[in-house]
UniProtKB/Swiss-Prot annotation:
Species classification: Bacteria, Pseudomonadati, Pseudomonadota, Betaproteobacteria, Neisseriales
Keyword Ribosomal protein: no
Cystines in this chain: none
PANTHER family xrefs: DNA-DIRECTED RNA POLYMERASE I SUBUNIT 2
Key words, A-Z: DNA-directed RNA polymerase, Nucleotidyltransferase, Transcription, Transferase
Ranges annotated as spanning the membrane: none
Broad enzyme group: transferase
Gene Ontology, cellular component aspect: DNA-directed RNA polymerase complex
Protein family: Belongs to the RNA polymerase beta chain family.
The reaction(s) this protein catalyses: RNA(n) + a ribonucleoside 5'-triphosphate = RNA(n+1) + diphosphate
Described purpose of this protein according to its UniProt entry: DNA-dependent RNA polymerase catalyzes the transcription of DNA into RNA using the four ribonucleoside triphosphates as substrates.
Enzyme Commission code(s) on record: 2.7.7.6
Protein's UniProt name: DNA-directed RNA polymerase subunit beta
A single MF term (Gene Ontology): DNA-directed RNA polymerase activity
Amino acid sequence: MSYSFTEKKRIRKSFAKRASVLDVPFLLATQIDSYTEFLQLGTPLDERKDVGLQAAFKSIFPIVSHNGYARLDFAHYVLGEPPFDVQECQLRGITFAAPLRARIRLTIFDKESSKPVVKEVRENEVYMGEIPLMTANGSFIINGTERVIVSQLHRSPGVFFEHDRGKTHSSGKLLFSARVIPYRGSWLDFEFDPKDLLYFRIDRRRKMPVTILLKALGYTNEEILSEFYSFDTFYLTKSGVFMRVVPERLKGEVAKFDIVAADGKLIVAKDKRITAKHIRDIQTAELDRIEVPADALLGKMLAHNVVNQNTGEVIARANEEVTEEILAKLALAEVEQVEVLFTNDLDQGAYISQTLRTDDIQDQTQARVAIYRMMRPGEPPTEDAVEALFQRLFFSDETYDLSRVGRMKFSSRTYQYKFDDKTPEWFKTLIGEKFASRRDVMEGTLATEDIVSVIAILTELRNGRGEVDDIDHLGNRRVRSVGELAENQFRAGLVRVERAVKERLNQAESDNLMPHDLINAKPVSAAIKEFFGSSQLSQFMDQTNPLSEITHKRRVSALGPGGLTRERAGFEVRDVHPTHYGRVCPIETPEGPNIGLINSLSVYARTNEFGFLETPYRKVVDGKVTNEIDYLSAIEEGRYVIAQANAELDGEGALIDELVTCREKGETILATPDRVQYMDVATGQVVSVAASLIPFLEHDDANRALMGANMQRQAVPCLRPEKAFVGTGIERSVAVDSGTTVVARRGGVVDYVDAGRVVVRVNDEEATAGEVGVDIYNLTKFTRSNQNTNINQRPVVKVGDHIARGDVVADGASTDLGELALGQNMTIAFMPWNGYNYEDSILISEKLVAEDRYTSIHIEELSVVARDTKLGPEEITRDIPNLSERMAGRLDESGIVYIGAEVEAGDVLVGKVTPKGETQLTPEEKLLRAIFGEKASDVKDTSLRVPTGTVGTVIDVQVFTREGIERDKRAQSIIDAELKRYRLDLNDQLRIFDNDAFSRIERLIVGKAANGGPKRLAKGTVIDQEYLAGLPTKHDWFDIRMADEDIAKQLELIKESLAQKREEFDLKFEDKKRKLTQGDELPPGVQKMVKVYLAVKRRLQAGDKMAGRHGNKGVVSRILPVEDMPYMGDGRPVDIVLNPLGVPSRMNIGQILEVHLGWAAKGIGERINRMVREQSAAEIRAYLERIYNETGKPEEIAALSDAEVMQLAQNLSKGMTFATPVFDGAKEAEIKHMLDLAYPDGDELTEKMGFNESKTQMTLFDGRSGEAFDRKVTVGVMHYLKLHHLVDDKMHARSTGPYSLVTQQPLGGKAQFGGQRFGEMEVWALEAYGAAYTLQEMLTVKSDDVTGRTKVYENIVKGEHKIDAGMPESFNVLVKEIRSLGLDMDLERY
């Protein structure tokens, strides 16, 4: 394998036993692909597919006027260029969006003509609002903040059959139901009640007998019965009553009479159960009819109306029960043959028949009126309204759409039903023959056949045949991603537009209107704005570190519009389902009320065209595993036998074991190799990105692994990120895919590097012809993330480095050499230490604080606005009343703080004064005013000050001024500095382009013949370096006339390219200047806005929360001086002391294995460090060969040059880097082998350490006394994180502050500057102690006794330390509450 430029610098030693068949896919593909498909930006207009915006437009257009004489057609849409780029949008607080324009054609028809004749056609582009664009990293900038649209996991449209699990009725009877769920439109439910009657409901309204729906669809009673039942035929003759024999129907029945063969032989005696043998005997005897007792017909249901052939009179109606009276009438009318319904109690229930009997509606019209009354109670049912409503319910494209997915699911569940020998004939006839043509239909509306087939399958379920659906199966739940969600919103906006347009279309001709006059795009842009700005699925991006970004974009939520609600979701929905395997992570989900409702996609999962989740598998042919990969959805997976990724294979890829552990239909089985059809692609296929970053995950309890996965997302980026010694091998993919690192777009040579920019000269073969090949990467410096953490990129390349496409050029936050680095590698000892690690507390060494190991920078944005008030405009100024000289000294003449100023709580950042209301002046004040002019008493100080508890440095200031208001000096200087920087940037780029172009020309023309040129160059002269150097400027090179036509053409191309670049740069500069100098869009009434950015340095301190990657979290309890920390045999103190009791009960043993392997990594690193100083490259190479290739996955160390080996050794000298992939990690023996390589027996250092036999524990010494501890201690290195729960953000104190308006009690929480709640139980405590006065002040003056509060303040000012407690305000609230109930309550003072 070949290593990339950054991989070469530090190769991770992997312990994987199985080579990877499939690389980790691009982790943001779901989001980016979905939105790309929605916009179809790069697709030619005529090749656009019917999805996204195109589908939304096509579903609404054409719009026809009510009178039919005007029509609007949609031709195509185009998206313009966004006016501002991503950074500018973030800075200005606006949305990163592009204008959408649609080409609309208005056709007007001639009213006079009998046929539709086109009178005129008008066409133009109509502005349809702005569509937010996705950034390269899969997020959106909405109003200046970065947001993510989370994918939604919702119930797929289609038909679902289920039962209530016996919970509805007290008897525990299973009540079956079916539900047809469209993508949009009314839901149709069918349900059995405890009496076995079948009902339907529309949109969960009142239930009605299902036969009403069938009659509304045009069925008569006879047709209903003939669809859902097989018939028994009885012959009424003079000699007796005979029944036609259908042997299959008799099986399992109890014979109500003797069944006798033609020869008189008894086949079945009366009251005996008919068995399969009896059936065979009947078939052998070839009985086609048997005589039955005269009363055998009693109680049966008639299948048809029975008519007297002579008189035409109806004797009995269909579905009527045969009684003695009806039998007499039949005999009288000489009816010879009667058909009755074949029903029994076992497997052919009379449910439809019974339901039909409860329904007294006669015809189609009545049935439709009944449905209308149920849907629109209280409205008079006119014929047109009834008809229109019924059509719009399920049969109209406009209001009902199953969608492609819904139709596919519907057809596969109903029309592709698998019959067996127990399936009744009526069902086979109905589904298998009558409706067979419906299998391939793809229409979005329902048809009569669809509804009938659902009822048929539901009755079959009640008859005991078929299976109900599992609604938690991922074949019945699908993912709606950004594109689809945005399309639905866009369509909803267009529907509103359509209503308005239809009204105006009638006037289109008379008023001579154009398409843009007819269409108002406000509803569309409002719908889109509302969705991106405030939908439940549009979330403020979690940007704490790269992992939290990537996880947020890969999240799937069952909540949101059209999904579940937290309160109503049961255990089944939240639970892990067998179909989650490889699709949704079983580990990563939040703790708390959302558990199981918010999930994360597994690493290899993707969505298919229908939105169902798929996971990849390797194909297995005849017990041999191939490298062919198929993606299977949960529905398809059920058909196969799938082996796990850790199944043993031989060298040829054949399965070795006689029985292989496999999965089939959600169950784990043991199968022979020849039965296996697929195999997992990777061991970590089951889990998500966050879970697959946990080394030794297989040794952790699931609950702790969940915490570990969640807490990695809260890790704060450290000042100097450090790679994890023990990783899992996926760190590089996460860092690169998250977009935090800068990745080379094309290969080439690094030309220039500084802290803010990397310039790469592109390889000739990757540069397009005539293009000047230079890539410039501007790095992000000290930028604020959504969570106030610091985003800062640092270059990892040097001038002259050769890099390839996809190589990491610069590291970002929490990345180290292109790998994710969330925490620091700490030397950890598991031992108690004087109670300071009781209950998961963490004891840390002062060294960590001194070395800034866990120091992080947080950037806070503080803003102030100057408004136009009723009393006059607010002013941003330096002249603030009563401002001390020290504070004013930090402000410039515009009243804004200088960059670089170190400020603390209470300091003024931006001076601002607000006009005060006019007050009555005393004559003395009037006199003073007249003498000394206007005084500052007219204004009050409303300056922006540093909030409490904050100390930091001002790193940036931005000033925004409304159009038409003059900028102050500070704003102007910021613009000038920005333009200067930009001009410098462009000049540098131009210089590099020039140099690159001329070096290409040099390579092109040196040694070639010329036809002439400057300095009287003779024809045929071969150009050399000397001649070129002698020309006055390099631009004179273009005047050389080359003999070779091709070279001359290339010269001309380069000249044009350079001129084009110059022009392009001038335009860029002008564009930038225009953007900067134009006024800013500010909210109404705001004249000016100033944003100040403070960088706050947060060092590790007691009270901060820390955690490992195995859910082993704790709070720092004490920072101990280095000299007091326990130390090892060679004198080195440990960094952190953890409580060993935190491991056994939590069952996260992964941390112990990590500690040991980490210790080996550190030992190997120290060993390499010594070798780099003392030994040759050959010896280092030999040692590295041993580390990399004695166990686990081999690496090609031999392929590296000596220089590369030395650089690798240099990078490993702090510690070796290991990868133990999830479920395929290092075994105990391998860890011990690594420990032996790090600390060989007989080595001086090994002796000093005082190891036990397995080198897993050592003797530690107490730093205070120097004595050895009684027992050996487990010491090692663990990657430990500092989490975003910092004590500085939580610590808070209040003396006086705001009160609640109604209760007058102090508010709660730090944000409100609230108090600490003294609750019911705390009151009990004071009561128990008898602390009466303390209790009194808690309940009165410290809480809601308003007069008492002010009195206490007065007393303190006077120096009298006493309280006068009065009536608590909450008591008054209680009195008012009681009075509101009509109870007059008076208070009497005693």
